[in-house]
């Protein structure tokens, strides 16, 4: 799958006239994509031309701290010949857009998959609007293309996606003919646990952050509970957000909730079975499915 014909020097992309295949690592700053980037920096994967992180502007501070650390490692002078630039792009502030009821283009939609009474769920547009599109726009910019310009036949892109073997069902082809999605961790036959083991061996004591928006409706009770106990300021911010999305806005006349129980987040009981005096016979495992 590796066909890197263009390499960068000193953190810059190669000259466009020499570039036929642009290798881009899609960086979610979660476990899999972080390990994928570090494996390249350690020489265990080919070197991509760049990595791109799409910022929703509402990630937990731990994600931004991790991204800063990751960037310092990957661009370190100690990694002679194995460094590559990390670009940060954004389509706007998903927190503000969700409250106002618009998406990144100003169209009136509830971009997050909020819950509503009557077993209704809003359309999930956030990944496409705030992750996929800004990365695609940056790729087109790196190819030297203007808005609406077609990708020349002599240029193509291989986009590295951090999906591991335990998530193989999430593998999808690119929607663009000029772009091919490739899955280095699948090729390496690495699971999420394998990624964690790789990271713990090389960076003992450092914790990999889970990458997801603070107020993602797909958070489970374990994650909400952890936020309430350990990041009270973030939890208070999300509670305030949850209250605001119940106010009618634009063309939405129904009440939305951030929690699947369809009750205010401030009133949800996140206690686990042990907290309630019962024995928990199961392990609740949270898997973030957005930023790998």
Label for each model-derived stretch:
Residues 2-5, 13-292:
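Nucleotide-activated chemistry modules centered on ATP-dependent adenylation/adenylyltransferase
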């Amino acid at each position: 799958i590796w066909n890197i014909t263009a390499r960068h020097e000193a953190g810059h992309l190669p000259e466009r006239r020499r570039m036929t295949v642009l290798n881009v690592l899609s960086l979610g700053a979660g476990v899999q994509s972080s390990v994928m980037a570090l494996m390249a920096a350690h020489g265990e994967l080919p070197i991509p031309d760049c990595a791109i992180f799409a910022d929703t502007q509402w990630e937990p501070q731990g994600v931004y701290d991790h991204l800063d650390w990751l960037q310092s490692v990957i661009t370190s002078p100690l990694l002679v010949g194995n460094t590559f630039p990390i670009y940060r792009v954004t389509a706007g502030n998903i927190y503000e857009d969700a409250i106002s009821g618009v998406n990144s283009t100003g169209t009136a939609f509830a971009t997050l998959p909020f819950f509503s009474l009557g077993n209704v769920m809003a359309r999930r547009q956030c990944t496409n609007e705030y992750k996929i599109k800004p990365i695609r726009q940056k790729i087109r910019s790196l190819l030297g293309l203007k808005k609406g310009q077609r990708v020349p036949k002599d240029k193509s892109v291989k986009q590295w996606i951090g999906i591991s073997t335990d998530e193989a069902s999430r593998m999808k082809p690119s929607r663009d003919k000029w772009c091919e999605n490739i899955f280095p961790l699948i090729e390496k036959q690495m699971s999420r646990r394998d990624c964690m083991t790789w990271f713990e061996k090389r960076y003992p004591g450092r914790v990999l952050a889970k990458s997801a928006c603070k107020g993602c409706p797909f958070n489970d009770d374990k994650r909400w509970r952890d936020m309430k106990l350990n990041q009270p300021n973030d939890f208070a911010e999300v509670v305030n957000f949850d209250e605001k999305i119940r106010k009618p806005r634009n063309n939405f006349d129904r009440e939305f909730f951030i929690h699947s129980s369809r009750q205010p987040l401030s009133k949800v009981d996140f206690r686990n079975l042990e907290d309630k005096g019962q024995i928990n016979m199961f392990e609740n495992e949270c898997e973030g499915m957005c930023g790998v």
